[in-house]
Amino acid sequence: MLFRSVHEIHKSSFWAAERIEKIQECKSVALLHETLIKTCSLSDVQFASSRIRQGFESWEKSKGLFEKLDQSDLARIIPHVLMFRPDEKEENLVYSWVGMQSTAAKINGLDWVEESTGEVAHRAFGCETQSFAEKVNVGYVKTMISGEPLYQHIRTLVRLEDQEPFWMPYERLLTRHVLRGGGFAVICNIYPTQYVNVSLAGNP
């Protein structure tokens, strides 16, 4: 889908200034849905990015057993993913691994990566909003409980310091893996792309 910028021409500088003022006012209006998520059929993975396809194929080959992941596949995938495990009381899912080349690491920075281990998935930190953290956490919990992969298209509003907010569309694959000790972990594989089947919620 192609999007074209819209240019307005006003003969009067007064009306142009009025229009600019109205647009600026709209930018401060809170959006009803800053994060939109669509769960897709697993059959759609064949049309996904190569990273998502490789992650799904590796999960299928290993039958969800982490120790049976092909070492070359693991070396290729692990720098790009997030991993979540239950905490000691098994009450919350927490970050147990953040790949340095993951989208989350690139957006939030090195300090966030270093502080992320042990953080609860549904609580906002870094540049996340609480609404975003809670919405994306639902998929982690579903995958952890069911053991079934989730392939999703997501569009979310990203707000960074000293930058204009922007919409980031991406696809996400969640898979559950059995670890060597017998516990479970959810691996989150994200790939930013414009080819997501989620309507644009509006302009920030």
Question: For each predicted feature, which ranges?
Answer:
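Glycine-rich short-loop/terminal segments
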Residues: C40-Q71
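Sensory/regulatory domains in signal-transduction proteins
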Residues: M1-L42, S72-P204
